[in-house]
């Protein structure tokens, strides 16, 4: 499933971290076509050195009795199709079923700040990041 909105990138993953939705903005920002990522685990986006930490947090969030739908906004390192790691502003939106049980996660990304500029957001995994490119 895709759409034609490219002002933001949106990705929806299920409880197992499998990509279920990928919009045109995600294809534009990250360089991966929807046909290549829908149905796959989201590992391709996660910087390899951060994968273990990412999956620990993701699985813990999805295993909760009730999901917290309010999540902080931050710059997240993303592995683009070109192999370049870029930092994109990211908001997680936890998806709950009708009984407030975890059902998945929506990730909404904005365009990265221009080189040498800051958007004022903190960086996820700051101890391992390189400056934005």
Question: Which role fits each region the language model picked out?
Answer:
Residues 8-12:
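Short hydrophobic secondary-structure edge segments in sensory/regulatory modules of signaling proteins
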Residues 18-20:
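Conserved hydrophobic beta-strand signature of PAS-family and PAS-like sensory domains
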Residues 26-37:
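PAS/PAS-like sensory domain cap-loop motif
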Residues 36-52:
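PAS-family sensory/regulatory domains
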Residues 80, 85-87, 104:
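Beta-strand residues that line the small-molecule/cofactor-binding core
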Residues 89-105, 111-119:
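Short loop/turn elements at sensory-signaling interfaces that couple input to output
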Residues 115-133:
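Sensory-domain boundary/capping and coupling elements
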């Amino acid at each position: 499933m895709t759409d034609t909105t490219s002002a933001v990138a949106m990705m929806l993953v299920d409880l197992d971290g499998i990509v279920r939705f990928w919009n045109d903005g995600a294809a534009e920002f990250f360089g991966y076509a929807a046909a290549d990522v829908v149905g796959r685990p989201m590992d391709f986006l996660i910087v390899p050195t951060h994968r273990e930490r990412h999956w620990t947090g993701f699985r813990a969030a999805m295993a909760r009795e009730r999901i917290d739908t309010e999540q902080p906004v931050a710059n997240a390192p993303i592995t683009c199709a070109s192999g370049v790691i870029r930092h994109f502003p990211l908001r997680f939106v936890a998806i709950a079923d009708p009984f407030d049980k975890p059902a998945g996660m929506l990730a909404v990304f904005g365009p990265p700040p221009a080189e040498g500029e800051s958007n004022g957001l903190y960086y996820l995994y700051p101890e391992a990041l390189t400056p934005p490119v």
